[in-house]
């Protein structure tokens, strides 16, 4: 009925928004497990680089609030491959991580939240891609397979 049609339209809209990023996203259970590993690595490495090193370095030459803004903007544009529309969102997320680092004095919470944030997004996209590819009549399914 109309609910299934609305659901299919929503799914197709989300798949269009993913664009070229689909190739990087998990499509099956094995890839999902690997994606979780990548998420953990991104949380640790990116937070160490952006909040641990760059923020620390800039904090010596500018006020901490300015260092938080600068590192968040650079962090956001470092994710430009996700599309310009997502850069602003990622800048805000970087600002939250910088704020958590300032509040706690530790990278552990930003690392953990970064990893969880990435993993949750990967799981959501996995659900989207696996449901689209399991529905062979879906036009979204044919686009995922490259048909």
Task: Locate the predicted segments by residue.
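Membrane-water interface of transmembrane alpha-helices
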Residues: 1-13
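Transmembrane helix-loop-helix hairpins at the membrane interface
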Residues: 19-147
């Amino acid at each position: 009925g109309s609910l299934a049609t609305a659901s299919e339209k929503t799914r197709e809209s989300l798949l269009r928004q993913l664009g070229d990023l689909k190739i990087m996203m998990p499509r099956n259970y094995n890839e999902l497990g690997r994606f979780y590993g990548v998420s953990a690595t991104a949380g640790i490495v990116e937070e160490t680089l952006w909040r641990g090193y760059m923020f620390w370095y800039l904090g010596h030459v500018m006020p901490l609030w300015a260092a938080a803004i600068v590192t968040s903007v650079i962090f956001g544009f470092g994710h430009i491959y996700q599309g310009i529309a997502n850069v602003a969102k990622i800048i805000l997320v970087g600002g939250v991580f910088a704020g958590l680092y300032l509040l706690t004095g530790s990278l552990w919470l930003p690392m953990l939240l970064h990893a969880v944030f990435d993993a949750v997004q990967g799981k959501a996209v996995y659900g989207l891609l696996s449901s689209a590819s399991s529905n062979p009549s879906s036009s979204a399914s044919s686009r995922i397979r490259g048909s």
